[in-house]
Swiss-Prot record:
<feature type="topological domain" description="Cytoplasmic">
    <location>
        <begin position="33"/>
        <end position="67"/>
    </location>
</feature>
<feature type="binding site">
    <location>
        <position position="79"/>
    </location>
    <ligand>
        <name>L-alanine</name>
    </ligand>
</feature>
<feature type="transmembrane region" description="Helical">
    <location>
        <begin position="301"/>
        <end position="322"/>
    </location>
</feature>
<feature type="binding site">
    <location>
        <begin position="273"/>
        <end position="274"/>
    </location>
    <ligand>
        <name>D-alanine</name>
    </ligand>
</feature>
<keyword id="KW-0472">Membrane</keyword>
<feature type="transmembrane region" description="Helical">
    <location>
        <begin position="18"/>
        <end position="32"/>
    </location>
</feature>
<keyword id="KW-0406">Ion transport</keyword>
<feature type="transmembrane region" description="Helical">
    <location>
        <begin position="259"/>
        <end position="274"/>
    </location>
</feature>
<feature type="topological domain" description="Extracellular">
    <location>
        <begin position="180"/>
        <end position="186"/>
    </location>
</feature>
<feature type="binding site">
    <location>
        <begin position="273"/>
        <end position="276"/>
    </location>
    <ligand>
        <name>L-alanine</name>
    </ligand>
</feature>
<feature type="binding site">
    <location>
        <position position="170"/>
    </location>
    <ligand>
        <name>D-alanine</name>
    </ligand>
</feature>
<feature type="topological domain" description="Cytoplasmic">
    <location>
        <begin position="203"/>
        <end position="206"/>
    </location>
</feature>
<dbReference type="GO" id="GO:0005886">
    <property type="term" value="C:plasma membrane"/>
</dbReference>
<keyword id="KW-0769">Symport</keyword>
<feature type="binding site">
    <location>
        <position position="75"/>
    </location>
    <ligand>
        <name>L-alanine</name>
    </ligand>
</feature>
<feature type="binding site">
    <location>
        <position position="75"/>
    </location>
    <ligand>
        <name>D-alanine</name>
    </ligand>
</feature>
<comment type="function">
    <text>Catalyzes the sodium-dependent uptake of extracellular D-alanine and L-alanine. Can also transport glycine. Binds glycine and both enantiomers of alanine, while strictly excluding other amino acids.</text>
</comment>
Amino acid sequence: MDFVSLVNTVNSFVWGPYMLVLLLGTGIFLTLRLGFMQIHTLPYALKLAFSKHQDETSEGDISHFQALMTALAATIGTGNIAGVATAYVLGGPGAIFWMWVTAFFGMATKYAEAVLAIKYRTVDDNGEMAGGPMYFLEKGLPDHGLGKILGVAFAFFGAFAAFGIGNMVQTNSVADAVASNFGVDPLITGFVLAIFTAAVILGGIKSIGKATGIIVPFMAVFYILAGLVILAMNIGYIIPAFGTIFSSAFNFSAGFGALIGTAIMWGVKRGVFSNEAGLGSAPIAAAAAKTDHPGRQALVSMTGTFLDTIVVCTITGLVLTIAGLKAFPGLTDLTGASLTAASFDALMPMGGLIVTIGLVFFAYSTVLGWSYYGEKCFEYLIGTKGIRLYRIAFVLVAFWGATASLPLVWNIADTLNGAMAIPNLIGLLLLSGVVVSETKAFNEIRKNEAKNA
């Protein structure tokens, strides 16, 4: 077996049915243990996330909002444009429904990750917060060295996955899109991306937090508004589009079992790719937030899954479904970002250009968010002395990624990304009692706050 075949085999195993069951199963388990908390706490969580009065006095490096925007920067990426289209093509419109299901249970997973990340976070040699699965695994599961082993495994996979899925794959997508639409040489695009990446990440988490606090709201609103305009222009197709999604998710025609199975597989897989619930990446950003209690920031982190999948991915999914219902010629031969761009373009003048611009911002912000994730994993492994070197390497790889051919790199990074989830999910299941305890304590704080309000 050659190296490429080996990578593909390992990738198929890592992202096979067992992983998808583990990811979704952990979300269901945590949802039950936490009493479906994502339903009754979502309004309060959204209020916390977007409140003008951010916590500036508690321990931490950045605000609630900046921590959420940093996580969303890494989360809202090409998966929201290309990933949804891939799920739509390979799993049918019903895959979108299963993305919603994954997001619902993933909100509990994202909440639990953040609770543990903040509870077990520490201050590094530079005086900055350091947290995430590697720390809560080591501190929360100290017996027989299991936690340390799992923590090192997570950090190793995360440090290298950041260069692939969070860097080269993103800059390559930008270079391809800009070259296709504007004829710009990938070398030029790569150079510009490297300069802009360096300008932000060399300043550390505070610089990243400030940048993502501006870029993410702008790019999300820009893309969502464009999608809403298309939906308004095709308002008569919205209900039929939802009908198509639901009927495809529960297709009771001949061979429905295989059809439903395919829809579930691609919906869950692309849903996880999009919102990253269970991968263990987002809690690294949550650990940097200024907060008085793990539960408070965890609720803010939970909204990331809602905003990413229930809002942004739904916009993409509805546009794709409406374009499919209108049966525009040429769409059936496309997939990924090309299908999304063509669908937007068919339904609105300059729609394809909007998708291209959105893709550029989404991918660039992903590079910023993942640079911090990779840096913190690297720091856990070798200490703070190598951080600047890691940042410089990240900038250089951003340039290389824009000009390289990446099929093998994508599969390796994809595999490492999935491998991150395994130690993280083990930790979430074994430490679920801690999450429940912290949640009960925070609920008491909220009750007292309500009485004194």
